[in-house]
């Protein structure tokens, strides 16, 4: 969804494309809250991309029910991570977002990022009032690939976007 598809949130303005690029440029570590070992889940797809050689991010998986995903250790909570992540990238239910925003503030993260389809005004306000950037309804993989030149249009008026250039 585009930013204008949502009701405005008093006290919070969605970051512009330039601001999102700056957030990603300033990021070295990302915690994926709600990471899944199921390859059909968006969190697994995004984690695979973020762990790839095309990014320089340290990626932490957070899920209290798992111990390893994509060969990486999984932590039960943000507080259990070995370092404070720059971005807390959330793949959980919308109603879980305020609590996760509180955790992100408590650990001292820089950015609370809710993935595509997630829009929670309370979480955005908790994050920004706690000194964090707040991004909602945006995908870290798509945004990174977009700014790094990794997204290509399949053709005029097709509506198809791919992360792989066809030859």
Regions from the PLM with identified roles:
Residues 2-26:
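Short N-terminal or domain-adjacent regulatory/targeting segments
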Residues 31-33:
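Conserved beta-strand elements of the Class I
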Residues 36-41, 48-69:
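NAD(P)-binding Rossmann-fold cofactor-contacting core
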Residues 53-57, 107-112, 130-132:
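A short helix->loop->beta-strand "cap" motif at the edges of active sites that frequently abuts
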Residues 73-83:
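Short acidic low-complexity segments
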Residues 82-119:
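Mid-chain, well-packed structural core segment of small domains
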Residues 116-142:
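Rossmann-fold NAD(P)-binding glycine/threonine-rich loop
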Residues 143-167:
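A charged, well-structured terminal subsegment
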